[in-house]
């Protein structure tokens, strides 16, 4: 395979639901990070051959969010752009598609990434189109319906995490301990400025002033497992609980028995947040790196995708990561750092068991439970965070980024530091 380089990458700080970024459109967030990533790379917009950007909650945003991002970033009209829709994998899928474009010889430089403003997702009134003549009509929350709902089984993503709890025997205590650790790691990382290099300030209006939003606002300080153990379960267990009937697409080796099997164990504290943010990544061929004198951060050496039963969508990273590592010619023992998106503590624990993660290498600065999960951006965000952390660690040579995808899928990439 030809060499594929990640020239530069950055992200916005992540906003809370209804927080600092609620009034900043997704296309604006994307335009800000793309403009900045080109600036950081010392590149001109006209050097870009194509832009691919993930975004899930596109209702009411206008045609082709990626094209809007491209134009807002100052990329010429002559450069095509398209929006990638693979639910939570969209931002990472854009990187995979960018790599394929370069390998196919269609492009030399592709800007990839993702953007999402979950706070701004509108409500829809489907009946209004053809017949809401009188009486009450049902409104649809497009944020939940298009981003967080399993259409195959008609329940929330949180219920798929409860299915994983039942099959893998994951206790409430394990999940709360995992979630508290994520928050504690992020609290320490923010205090040490570990995220500063990867974050691009976003101008936001506060009353009459314009201020820079540049610190993730979702993390909580002083979180303990004992403290969050008081919260109630947030999602109903599936009708099949405590023994959900699923089709396994890989051999399960990490299943255990749990004394609280069949109970509600997923809470607001051990699940990821509902958030806003964007991330951008520049991919380039070896020829483009030489031609323009670019200084890459990392190589993209492998990627993979996989499918699982939608009822247990959270374990999608298992086949995806195995495929990515096989393509890269590495094993989990060769991986120095892992960014595994924390959609739920339940699925994160199951994935770690199945892949044999050394947890001291995983989400060393916390993950989506603490930082948040702007769904269309997260796949790119974890790559950005992974690479920036690798650059801070001389011993970190190779990294794995992976995440689960609603509908029963996963994506993963393997990178090597330059």
Model regions: which residues?
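Conserved active-site "lid/cap" helical segment
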Residues: 1-61, 65-73, 77-80, 160-172, ...
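N-terminal extracellular/periplasmic Venus flytrap/periplasmic-binding protein-like
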Residues: 10-12, 22-32, 40, 174-286, ...
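Active-site pocket-shaping loop/turn-to-helix segments
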Residues: 12-39, 57-59, 82-99, 119, ...
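Beta-strand segments within the central parallel beta-sheet cores of soluble alpha/beta enzyme folds
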Residues: 46-54, 80-85, 110-115, 176-181, ...
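Conserved catalytic cysteine-centered active-site region
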Residues: 55-110, 152-159, 222, 226-273, ...
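Flexible glycine-/small-residue-enriched beta->alpha junction loops
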Residues: 109-164
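Active-site pocket-lining segment
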Residues: 160-162, 198, 206, 301-370
